C-alpha cells in the first residue's frame, strides 16, 4: 500500500457527501466511528456516526435555507501512515447557496484518522475546523459569540466578542 491509499478513502467519503449519498459515506467509515464538528451536538460516535452526523447537518443547513453543499479538498498538508493506522490533515473549502447567493467557506481544515481493515482503509474519526465564509448571506450559520476572560490582580474583566458576517 502506498502513502496515498488513505487519501483515496477520504476522497470517497467526500465524494459521497457531494452526491448526498450517506450510504457511500458510511461505507468509507469504520465501525465504530467518531465525528467532531462545529454543529450541535458536536460529537457523534458509533456504528451510524456518519449517517447521524449527515442527518443533523442537513437539519442545521435547512433552517437558514442553505442548499447545494459541496466540499473540495486541497492537497494534503500531512499524511502519516504507520502500519494499520493513518493520520491525514487536508485543507478544505465548503460551498453552498443561501437564498440564491453563493457562499464559500475557505480556510477550513479536515483532519482524519483511519484504520486499515481487511477490506481496506476506513475512517475511524474526523474533525472539521471551520474556515471563513465570504460573502455571507445567512448570519444564522456563522454567527459566533465568544467570551474571553482576562484576569488581573484586582478583578476579573470579561469581554464579549460577537462576530457577524452580513450581506454585502
Task: Place the predicted regions along the sequence by residue.
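Short beta-strand segments enriched in hydrophobic/aromatic residues
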Residues: 29-30, 92-94, 127-130
Amino acid at each position: 500500500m502506498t502513502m496515498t491509499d488513505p487519501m483515496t478513502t477520504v476522497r470517497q467519503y467526500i465524494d459521497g457527501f457531494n452526491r448526498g449519498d450517506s450510504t457511500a459515506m458510511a461505507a468509507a467509515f469504520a465501525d465504530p466511528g467518531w465525528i467532531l464538528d462545529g454543529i450541535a451536538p458536536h460529537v457523534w460516535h458509533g456504528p451510524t456516526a456518519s449517517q447521524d452526523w449527515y442527518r443533523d447537518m442537513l437539519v442545521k443547513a435547512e433552517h437558514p435555507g442553505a442548499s447545494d453543499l459541496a466540499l473540495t479538498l486541497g492537497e494534503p498538508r500531512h499524511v502519516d501512515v504507520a502500519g494499520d493506522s493513518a493520520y491525514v490533515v487536508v485543507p478544505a473549502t465548503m460551498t453552498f447557496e443561501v437564498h440564491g447567493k453563493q457562499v464559500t467557506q475557505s480556510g477550513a481544515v479536515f483532519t482524519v484518522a483511519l484504520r486499515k481493515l481487511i477490506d481496506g482503509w476506513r475512517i475511524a474519526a474526523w474533525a472539521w475546523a471551520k474556515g471563513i465564509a465570504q460573502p455571507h448571506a445567512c448570519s444564522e450559520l456563522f454567527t459566533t459569540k465568544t467570551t474571553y476572560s482576562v484576569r488581573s490582580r484586582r478583578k476579573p474583566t470579561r469581554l464579549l466578542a460577537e462576530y457577524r458576517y452580513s450581506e454585502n
